[in-house]
Design a protein with these regions (language model features):
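Rossmann-like S-adenosyl-L-methionine
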Residues: 31-34, 47-53, 58-59, 64-91, ...
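Extended interfacial segments that mediate partner engagement and assembly in macromolecular machines
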Residues: 167-178, 184-304
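N-terminal mitochondrial targeting presequence
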Residues: 1-46
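Terminal RNA-binding accessory module
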Residues: 33, 38-178, 182
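Short, acidic/hydrophobic/Gly-rich beta-strand patch recurrent on exposed beta strands
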Residues: 123-128, 268-274, 460
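Hydrophobic beta-strand signal
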Residues: 146-148, 242, 317
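Short, low-complexity Ser/Thr-rich regulatory SLiMs
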Residues: 151-153, 245-249, 320-322, 557, ...
Length: 582
């Protein structure tokens, strides 16, 4: 592990003074402005405790023990319980009579009407007695649909069902919008039958419910959730697909007693069915970019031709890689992998498919990388990023320009250039290969990205060099202990955090409160764990006299047609009010 301080010295020692580019941020919330000006007493912060880490303990039903970070079951159960509670209140107010109810047996088909859409993207339908819920995929509020019951969770008052057909469509359903022949069975998408406008509104509601239900904060401390930032592309946006198959062909149809071996059967290659542990054979996925879709076709053919060489199943990789070749440069021979941004590409690591797109000053060449350890290249505006193809990088390139521009616009508070101690340092925790450190770098005198992954730091340093950013450094360290050696004054530091789905550890949040960065940008792929973590920051540490106030929260639609939404929250450091003398 590299020492953070020595790593920073290597790139800060040669820095000359430079002009800090101040970008106007949105005004702080009304509550924040009022407290700063009047030192008004802070009201009770919590209406109940924030949700704990999603460990599955409250669920009596069996869950995937390897997927503790997603919180899918807890989020679904929260929506179910709230629907039941609202219905119970309505029945009490109208003196509704109790209706006898007998839970149908598994695999029975029944007709139900969808009451609402859950944060998981599933429809929720009340049983006749109003005290039990059917979870129905691929539906919208108002739909009357036929479903097949597949799994009961009686102690939790709900059952999972398979969608069979629409009896009467709800007002938000438009099946003409469905762009995939597998929709309705594949678990990958949930919302293709909804207009994009309705999808964005639904995702805004997901963020609202996350903060209302999982933070425990009183409503006055949660700003109005901003409108969901739209993806420029709603199909054809995914730069990475990872289909899989369950078993290989080795040992099947093998030669015995001198006989010629029979051709082994090729298993389904694709994604899982909804509500089943079975794979669908997926020939094409319209969410993938053009080159990724070509790669899927090529890889399916390759696997089928070589299935006997697989002893077991496997997960395949299709990752888009982009090269920009100046028009005045020598033309690239067909099939030859170019050198991109001064970083050597990996030969023989792609499917051989090439798509060329002519731009004003250059030609883009797109290839589909299939080797997890090969280098892939991606551009965000004019910034170039190289990564191991199997490593994490955002999968929707079409939204990244607007996404990073939004964060740049929020990074520096209004009036920063007039402050006696302006923010001029960036600390990027969970930095990965440097997306935020690099795209925010022009705003700061010095920027430091930290990540636990050694491979990510290697890529990040290469990316800083390729983008000619001498004021940007990276260090390998555990994010839970990174604050111990940060060389920046907290009063002048912006902290960016982008943790995995499970959110920040309690130790990380405790150390962050000890460090006291002046401003925080919290980016999250799980708005429910984000809400939980931000509640800890808002509660603060009274002994350290530090807490945070939420300036803004907004969702970003990285994955159109799915129930997933990412969140960006901006927070400002403040202190506890001083008790008035008696």
């Amino acid at each position: 592990m590299f020492a953070i301080r020595s790593s920073v010295r290597r790139f800060t020692s040669s820095l000359s003074s430079q002009t800090l580019i101040a970008v106007q941020a949105r005004p702080a919330s009304k509550l924040y402005r009022q407290r700063r000006s009047t030192n008004a007493p802070v009201p009770a912060i919590m209406q109940n405790g924030p949700k704990k880490h999603f460990d599955g303990k409250r669920k009596k039903a069996k869950v995937d023990k390897n997927n503790k970070s997603s919180g899918h079951d807890e989020v679904l159960l929260c929506d179910i319980n709230q629907l039941l509670k609202r219905n119970e209140t309505e029945q009490a107010e109208t003196n509704g009579d109790s209706v006898p109810f007998s839970l149908p047996e598994k695999f029975t088909e029944i007709d139900v009407k969808i009451s609402e859409l859950s944060s998981t993207g599933d429809g929720l339908a009340l049983a006749e007695n109003g005290k039990y819920v059917y979870v129905v995929p691929f539906t919208v509020p108002g739909d009357t649909v036929r479903v097949k019951l597949v799994k009961h969770f009686e102690s939790l008052s709900y059952s999972l069902t398979d969608f069979v057909k629409v009896i009467e469509p709800g007002p938000q359903r438009n099946d003409a919008l469905i762009g995939c022949k597998y929709f309705g069975e594949c678990s990958g998408c949930q919302l293709q039958m909804m207009s994009y406008e309705d999808q964005l509104a639904h995702k805004r509601r997901i963020v609202e419910k996350a903060y209302a239900n999982f933070s425990g904060l009183i409503p006055e401390l949660i700003p109005t959730i901003g409108e969901t930032f739209a993806s420029p592309m709603q199909f054809g946006y995914r730069t990475k697909l990872t289909p899989h198959f369950a078993h290989g062909g080795a040992g099947k149809g093998s030669k015995q007693d001198g006989e010629e071996p029979s051709q082994p059967q090729v298993p389904p290659i694709g994604f899982t069915y909804k509500n089943r542990r079975l794979d669908m054979d997926i020939e094409d996925c319209p969410l993938g970019t053009d080159i990724v879709r070509r790669g899927l076709t090529s890889e399916r053919k390759r696997v089928a031709e070589n299935i006997r060489s697989y002893k077991r199943g496997a997960t395949l990789l299709m990752r888009e890689s982009t090269a920009r070749i100046p028009k005045d440069a020598a033309p690239t021979a067909d099939g030859e992998t170019p050198n991109v941004g001064g970083i050597a590409a990996t030969p023989n690591a792609d499917t051989g498919d090439v798509i060329r797109i002519e731009r004003e000053n250059y030609i883009e060449e797109k290839r589909c990388i299939t080797d997890n350890n090969a280098t892939s290249f991606e551009y965000v505006d004019d910034y170039i990023f190289s990564n191991k193809a199997g490593a994490f990088f955002q999968n929707n390139n079409s939204i990244l320009s607007g996404f990073t521009e939004y964060i740049r616009s929020q990074a520096i508070p209004a009036g920063n250039d007039q402050d006696a101690k302006p923010i001029k340092y960036l600390l990027d925790a969970y930095s990965g290969s440097g997306l935020f450190t690099i795209t925010l770098s022009p705003l700061f005198k010095s920027s430091l990205g930290v990540d636990i992954g050694g491979d990510s730091i290697v890529s990040a340093r290469e990316n800083a060099r390729a983008n000619n950013l001498p004021n940007t450094g990276f260090a390998a360290a555990d994010a839970a202990t990174l604050f111990k050696e940060v060389p920046y004054p907290p009063d002048q530091t912006l902290l960016v955090i982008d943790p995995p789905r499970k959110g920040c550890s309690e130790d990380f949040l405790r150390q962050m409160l000890d460090f006291k960065p002046r401003r925080v940008v919290y980016v999250s792929c799980n708005v429910h764990t984000q809400a939980r973590d931000i509640a800890v920051m808002v509660q603060g540490d009274e002994k350290q006299n530090v807490r945070y106030e939420i300036e803004s929260v907004r969702g970003f639609d990285f994955f159109p047609q799915t129930g997933h939404v990412e969140g960006v929250a901006i927070l400002n450091r403040t202190s506890f009010p001083q008790a008035e003398a008696v």
